[in-house]
């Protein structure tokens, strides 16, 4: 009997040890999963493919093969695949399936982009498959526009009138019309292409599309910002302080455009130097808008289940957790301006030792205004009201700084 009790005791201890080991292993695994998730969130390029010339040339060769087979078309296909007027130069980057390549087009440097590598990887237009038979009746334009409007709504979260959608879609049937439809449909499934096609007429801070071939589209090449640049952007040492003031003012202009000039506010959820470039006149241009969302889509993204505020952070767009219902609020609590102040302006204006041509008092005021701007919102949730006030303060201080720098040159 004592022996049986001893065996039961050893079995109980063994069971407790196994349970403890399992719990420890589960905690260890959860820790690594969390660490991996945080790493991927901060550095999405970790899982990116290696960007090589060989792979990039192979991708474009496959694109041209699909063009010759009559599967796709576009204004740039002839120059790329036949005429030799659009020439590959180098691979810029691959990230999360997206392919970004540099090319030379008729003496102009351009960037070729696609969300996916192969044309066949995009879901086809259902109506085209249904009407694929020879002599099949034409697809009603009303049906097509309805599908396009639905895809745009799914992409942007916006309902647009037909006249706004027109630039995205081939107007009338004719030779090669099916290839045009198939190509346009693959482009419509790329959020950035839709932004670049619809918004440049409304804002100078968005790149226009120059043309396309199948699922690849071309935009102007502009040197992107980088944390490796001392001034975040490629600027000459001479006149750098003036250039930074001009660029900062252009960032403010962009914030104003994105907050006010569209039917809904446009939220930037991935603010970093690499996603912006500057033109020769120091105009800031958003060159990567994969993480930009209009208000309806932003609300949909933010409104998720939560156990704390940290669950309501979507990259640079933050919400707050309502612990009564364990749901993130649909309203963003920080702003584009706040994030730009934090991630861009702090780098330029965090020290009063810069720009000796500018008075110490003005440098100190600008430093304090940037600090105030970067810290607004988040806890109070009143970031939009606060941003409006600090926006005008920053604008006045930057204009005053620019004036002092220009007068010092005389």
UniProtKB/Swiss-Prot annotation:
Keywords: Disulfide bond, Endoplasmic reticulum, Membrane, Signal-anchor, Transmembrane, Transmembrane helix. Among the many cysteines in the lumenal domain, most are probably involved in disulfide bonds. A motif (May mediate ER retention) lies at residues 18-19. Residues 41-410 are lumenal. InterPro entries: FAM69_kinase_dom, FAM69_N. Mainly expressed in the brain and eye, some expression in kidney and skeletal muscle. It is found in: Endoplasmic reticulum membrane. Pfam families: PIP49_C, PIP49_N. It is a single-pass type II membrane protein. One of its GO terms (cellular component) is endoplasmic reticulum membrane. Residues 1-19 are cytoplasmic. The chain crosses the membrane at residues 20-40. Belongs to the DIPK family. This is Divergent protein kinase domain 1C. It comes from Mus musculus (Mouse).
């Amino acid at each position: 009997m004592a022996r049986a009790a001893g065996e039961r005791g050893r079995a109980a201890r063994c069971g407790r040890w196994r349970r403890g080991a399992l719990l420890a292993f589960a905690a260890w695994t959860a820790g690594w999963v969390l660490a991996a998730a945080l790493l991927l969130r901060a550095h999405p390029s970790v899982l990116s493919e290696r960007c090589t010339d060989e792979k990039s040339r192979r991708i474009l060769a496959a694109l041209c093969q699909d063009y010759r087979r009559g599967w796709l078309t576009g204004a740039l296909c002839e120059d790329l695949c036949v005429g030799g007027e659009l020439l590959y130069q180098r691979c810029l980057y691959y990230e999360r399936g997206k392919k970004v390549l540099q090319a030379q087009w008729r003496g102009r440097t351009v960037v070729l982009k696609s969300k996916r590598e192969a044309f066949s990887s995009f879901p086809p237009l259902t109506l085209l498959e249904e009407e694929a038979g020879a002599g099949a009746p034409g697809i009603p334009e009303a049906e097509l526009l309805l599908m396009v409007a639905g895809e745009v709504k799914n992409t942007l979260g916006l309902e647009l009138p037909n006249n706004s959608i027109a630039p995205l879609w081939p107007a009338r049937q004719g030779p090669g019309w099916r290839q045009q439809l198939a190509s346009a449909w693959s482009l419509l499934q790329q959020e950035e292409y839709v932004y670049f096609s619809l918004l440049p007429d409304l804002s100078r801070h968005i790149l226009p599309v120059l043309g396309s071939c199948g699922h690849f589209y071309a935009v102007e090449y502009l040197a992107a910002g980088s944390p490796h640049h001392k001034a975040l952007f490629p600027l000459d040492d001479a006149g750098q302080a003036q250039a930074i003031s001009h660029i900062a003012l252009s960032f403010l202009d962009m914030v104003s455009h994105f907050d006010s000039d569209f039917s809904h506010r446009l939220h930037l959820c991935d603010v970093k130097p690499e996603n912006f470039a500057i033109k020769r006149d120091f105009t800031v241009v958003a060159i990567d808008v994969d993480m930009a969302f209009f208000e309806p889509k932003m609300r949909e993204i933010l409104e998720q289940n939560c156990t704390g505020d940290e669950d309501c952070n979507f990259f640079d767009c933050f919400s707050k957790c309502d612990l009564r219902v364990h749901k993130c609020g649909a309203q963003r609590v920080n702003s584009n301006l706040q994030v730009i102040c934090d991630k861009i302006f702090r780098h330029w204006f965090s020290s009063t030792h810069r720009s000796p041509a500018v008075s110490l008092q003005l440098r100190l005021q600008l430093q304090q205004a940037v600090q105030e701007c970067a810290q607004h919102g988040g806890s109070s949730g009143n970031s939009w009201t606060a941003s409006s006030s600090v926006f005008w303060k920053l604008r006045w201080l930057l204009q005053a700084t620019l004036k002092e720098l220009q007068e010092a040159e005389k």
